[in-house]
């Protein structure tokens, strides 16, 4: 069983819907990584370590950039799915992006993205393939699920937001621990972090 979501992103062609699924307690990370390294086209997905994803907006920003670059023949990596992982990196170092955001043998929570680049890639075909090949517990692709998986300390370190970002992460941690603030403070902090992450993705390669 998979709880796959299919989305048509604004400002992108209807012919390229995006399929997203989230899993917990992954048991076959090594197998999935081997398929990617072997170039097995049946496993052409963006396999992302969910501990490095802050929110739905975070991953959708990377997907949007990758699909847009795919449509405009501006890919810097092998295909649109590797480009999604690359886009998350916020820099022009492809190897670093895969090391930080891609699936590894130690990945336990997995976010899977598949872009329909051909008519035969459908919600049903992706769902069936994932159901047969992902050994993990499917879970809803929600903000709550992602928040329970995110390694905020590592995310802060990778994106290097400086004191402003560090203060916002600290404020969010304090609210969730019941030390300070309110639900409004929490939402404001999450929105600010989202903006920082989406900005990093949008300007990748500009400097």
From Swiss-Prot:
GO cellular component: chromosome, telomeric region; cytosol; EKC/KEOPS complex; nucleus
Tagged with keyword Transcription regulation: yes
Keyword Transcription listed: yes
Cross-referenced InterPro entries: CGI121/TPRKB (IPR013926), CGI121/TPRKB_sf (IPR036504)
Matching Gene3D superfamilies: CGI121/TPRKB (3.30.2380.10)
Coiled coil: none
Family annotation (SUPFAM superfamilies): PF0523-like
Pfam families, A to Z: CGI-121
Keywords: Activator, Chromosome, Nucleus, Telomere, Transcription, Transcription regulation, tRNA processing
GO term, biological process aspect, one: tRNA threonylcarbamoyladenosine modification
Localization terms from the record: Nucleus; Chromosome, Telomere
Origin superkingdom: Eukaryota
PANTHER family per the UniProt record, alphabetical: CGI-121 FAMILY MEMBER, EKC_KEOPS COMPLEX SUBUNIT TPRKB
Function according to Swiss-Prot or TrEMBL: Component of the EKC/KEOPS complex that is required for the formation of a threonylcarbamoyl group on adenosine at position 37 (t(6)A37) in tRNAs that read codons beginning with adenine. The complex is probably involved in the transfer of the threonylcarbamoyl moiety of threonylcarbamoyl-AMP (TC-AMP) to the N6 group of A37. CGI121 acts as an allosteric effector that regulates the t(6)A activity of the complex. The EKC/KEOPS complex also promotes both telomere uncapping and telomere elongation. The complex is required for efficient recruitment of transcriptional coactivators.
NCBIfam families given in the database record: PRK14886.1-1
Subunit structure, interactors included: Component of the EKC/KEOPS complex composed of at least BUD32, CGI121, GON7, KAE1 and PCC1; the whole complex dimerizes.
Family the entry assigns: Belongs to the CGI121/TPRKB family.
Stated name of the protein: EKC/KEOPS complex subunit CGI121
Gene name linked to the record: CGI121
